[in-house]
Amino acid sequence: TAEPPFPSGLRSPAKIAIRAWWDARIQQGRYLSADGRLFHIDSARDFTGLRAELAITATELIGEQGEYRPDRAPPRACRVFLNYDAPWLDENGQATAYRIRAEVALIETGRVQVGDLLEVDRVRYYVVDYADGTDDGIVRGIWLERVQ
């Protein structure tokens, strides 16, 4: 049996196959929420051509339930993937420390800013920096420090 690899970020490494009634709003690049799960649609095909049923391939956005607390705005529920031992690279690309790196879904949080707060499992974290090159319009990587 081929097990999917262990997740290393907010995106599940295994693609999900979904069947749904035809709906013009279900298109590639959109999001689908069902039973507390969040999916980013990779493809949606009307495989019969009759506008009756869709075959959808999607990526599930997984993570721990958290709360994004932007400065001067109401809190928002979100999924957070935490990596407690991510290498922090200096300007030469050398790992100089290990810090907490997180990924959040932009559809749930919007563009997280430095200085904002994330809370996961009753633990609060400050957003201290962006993880360079990780914002792809779906997921944003950020560096965190635990609030003492």
Question: Residue ranges of each PLM-predicted region?
Answer:
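Short, conserved turn/kink motifs that form compact alpha/beta structural patches or helix kinks used as
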Residues: 1-148
